[in-house]
C-alpha cells in the first residue's frame, strides 16, 4: 500500500484522539448487532441475545478494545501492515476459521463509529484514508487464506 503524506497525517491525527476502549467496544458491539452471524465467533461471551445485552457486555467491550489496539499497530506500521498482521492472519484462518469478508465488515463498522464520534471533523478525505487503512488491514488479515 502506498500512503500519501496527507493520508498518513489524517490517520495519525485522528488516531491520536481516539478512545480505543470506547470506540473499540462500540465497533465490536455494532458488528455483532448489525451482522448477527458474527456472534458465532464469540461463544464464550455470554448473553448476546439483543442489542442492549451486546452493548453492555463486558467481554464485548474488552475484546473490542483489543481489536482496536491491533488497528493501532497498523497505524504505527503503515508501511508494513502485512507483516504486522501475519500472526493474527494465521490465528483467524487456521484456528478461528473466520470468513475474511468479516474483516471488511469490521472495518466499515469502525469507520461509521469514527464518523459518529468526530462528526464534521471526519472529512471525506479522512474517511477515504481510513477506508484505505481498513482495506489494507482486512487484506493483511485475509493473507493466510490465499
Swiss-Prot record:
Describe tissue expression.
Red blood cells.
SUPFAM superfamilies given in the database record: Globin-like
GO CC entries? blood microparticle; haptoglobin-hemoglobin complex; hemoglobin complex
Signal sequence extent: none
One GO-annotated biological process of the protein? hydrogen peroxide catabolic process
Sites binding heme b sit at: 63, 92
Q: Where is the Globin domain?
A: 2-146
**Keyword Metal-binding: yes or no?**
yes
Report keywords, A-Z. Heme, Iron, Metal-binding, Oxygen transport, Transport
Record flagged with keyword Endoplasmic reticulum: no
Q: Which Pfam families match?
A: Globin
GO molecular function (one): peroxidase activity
Described function: Involved in oxygen transport from the lung to the various peripheral tissues.
Check the record and name the PANTHER family matching this protein: HEMOGLOBIN FAMILY MEMBER, HEMOGLOBIN SUBUNIT EPSILON
Spell out the subunit comment. Heterotetramer of two alpha chains and two beta chains.
Write out the similarity annotation: Belongs to the globin family.
Name of the molecule in the record: Hemoglobin subunit beta-1
Query: To which species is this protein native?
Result: Iguana iguana (Common iguana)
- Taxonomic classification: Eukaryota, Metazoa, Chordata, Craniata, Vertebrata
